[in-house]
Amino acid sequence: MKSVIFALFLVYLLIVRAAEANENIGLGLDRGSSGTIAAKQQMGIELANDPNGPGRRRRAPAENEDFLKHS
């Protein structure tokens, strides 16, 4: 019971502070499952094309050589 009251108190503080700062509260409910997948895809594309990012994933050359030897 105390944990529920504490959680409600934290939510209340979040709402009060957001109202004081004139900000909207984002609870993650504005985007559905397909929107989340599309957002992750877009972030991955942006990271792959970013010059300072990790780049795109490439397979190790040893795997490709083994595949070519057996064919």
From Swiss-Prot:
InterPro entries: DH2-like. It comes from Scolopendra morsitans (Tanzanian blue ringleg centipede). Residues 1-21 form the signal peptide. It comes from the Eukaryota. Its main location: secreted. This is U-scoloptoxin(21)-Sm1a. One of its GO terms (cellular component) is extracellular space. It is found in: Secreted. Keywords: Secreted, Signal, Toxin. Belongs to the scoloptoxin-21 family. One of its GO terms (molecular function) is G protein-coupled receptor binding. Expressed by the venom gland. Residues 60-71 have a biased composition (Basic and acidic residues). GO terms for biological process: body fluid secretion. Residues 45-71 are annotated as: Disordered.
